[in-house]
Regions:
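Extreme N-terminal starter segment of soluble prokaryotic enzymes
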Residues: 1-4
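Gly/Ala-rich phosphate-binding loop of Rossmann-like dinucleotide-binding domains
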Residues: 37
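Active-site metal-binding loops of divalent metal-dependent hydrolases
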Residues: 7-9
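Thr-Gly-centered strand-to-loop micro-motif
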Residues: 26, 48, 146-147
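Conserved beta-alpha-beta core of the PfkB/ribokinase-like small-molecule kinase fold
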Residues: 119-180
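Conserved N-terminal subdomain of the carbohydrate kinase-like
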Residues: 11-23, 40-121, 135-140
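Short secondary-structure boundary/capping elements
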Residues: 24-28, 101-106, 125-129, 152-155
């Protein structure tokens, strides 16, 4: 496996100065994997979804060459949900709702084929989960990228700082950088 992305596959409500979209497919892992599909042929995704997540969206990922063996489906539960409002400059946002749902008890188990990935993208998850994923790798990837947000800085800063010591690249906006 060349690239493994671990993160959220979710539903989002997004409000911008130009409009609003409700219950759209969201999540960092969703869009990281879709974007990477233009450049990487051998990639996998690790996440958890509820029974409410549309199967056709998983099929779409597979059609893009994204291996979805690492997506756990909890049929009786709801998928992660995030709602946010972006401001005029699109860098500043307010988190309105974070419903962890299936993510609340997510314990990712990397498929064996994923554990030797050359590149690892740790999406927006709890720092404890991010650390657990790092510890599941057979060897340190060539590059480890981490995404996080204000929510985790607010409730799990010590864990986040520990994970930061084991990554190469951090992707946050200017507001999050000031908060960190």
């Amino acid at each position: 496996m060349k690239l493994v992305t671990v993160g959220t596959v979710a539903f989002d409500d997004i409000e911008t100065p130009r409009g609003r979209a409700e219950m759209v497919i969201g999540g960092a892992a969703t869009y990281i994997s879709r974007s990477a599909s233009f450049f990487v042929e051998n990639q996998g995704i690790v996440s958890v979804i509820g029974g409410d997540f549309p199967e056709d969206e998983l099929e779409e990922m597979r059609s893009l060459g994204i291996n979805t063996d690492g997506i756990e489906i909890k049929k009786e539960e709801k998928s992660f949900f995030w709602a946010g409002r972006y401001h005029d400059n699109m860098n500043k946002r307010d988190t309105l709702i974070t419903d962890l749902n299936v993510l609340a008890n997510f314990e990712p188990k990397l498929p064996e084929a994923y554990r030797s990935a050359e590149y690892l993208m740790l999406g927006n998850l709890t720092p404890d989960i991010q650390m657990d994923v790092l510890n599941q790798m057979h060897k340190r990837p060539k590059l480890v990228v981490l995404d996080t947000m204000n929510f985790w800085m607010d409730i799990a800063l010590d864990g986040l700082v520990a994970v930061l010591k084991r990554i190469d690249v951090l992707t946050i906006n200017d507001e999050e950088a000031r908060q960190l």
